[in-house]
Amino acid sequence: RISSYQFDPPIDSSDMEPAFWAKLVEIINYNYNSFDGFVILHGTDTMAYTASALSFMLENLSKPVILTGSQLPIGTLRTDGKENLITAIEIAAAKNPDGTAIVPEVCIFFENHLMRGNRTTKINAENFNAFRSFNYPPLARVGIHIKYEPNLIRKPDLSKPLKPHYLFDTNVVILTLFPGIQEGIVSALLHVPGLLSLIHI
């Protein structure tokens, strides 16, 4: 059984924000016991951000949450969206012989690669191979068959129920230092009203 839910109006991925992440978590939590897995169709600009956020917001996750999308609109002749969607659904429904999910974590599926959500970055806006996981190997590769990598896939504690988190504090800023950065820029960031945390990368 496949069911669908759509935001009304649809959200452009460039407008994604924590409130929408919380809504996604709410939908997954409400339907958690009714489905084997979940597929989220998402624009590519902020897909990696959403996947990373959901991986932390869905504590004790034991079912697949697969994000996918396309580089070309799904209505165009050469779109990659149809294959990405069909394969994402197959992965979300895939089970081990004991009935547990093969990939019980938040992932991005794109161009024949299944990647851990919080390790994935968008690297290209022109090619179908738009995402890459630099510091962690793909969890599965897709050709004629889907080849999973069981040793790389997170093993959930099935004794623990899903624990959803909804609140994000947005009073946080990321600062990248580089040679020649002006002291006034750093000072301005440090004195933003209500700022609770500054992350240096």
Named regions from a protein language model:
Residues 1, 116-195:
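Accessory alpha-helical/coil subdomains and C-terminal extensions
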Residues 1-29:
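ATP/NTP phosphate-donor binding region
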Residues 36-37, 194-196:
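Structural motif
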Residues 199-201:
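Conserved small/polar residues in nucleotide/adenosyl-binding loops
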Residues 37, 62-66, 105:
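Proline-centered loop/turn at the N-terminus of a beta-strand
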Residues 67-144:
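Internal gly/pro-rich beta-alpha loop/helix module
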Residues 40, 66-67, 197:
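Structural recognition of the beta-strand scaffold that forms the well-ordered cores
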Residues 40-63:
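Short Gly/Thr/Asp-enriched flexible loops that form oxyanion-binding sites at enzyme active sites
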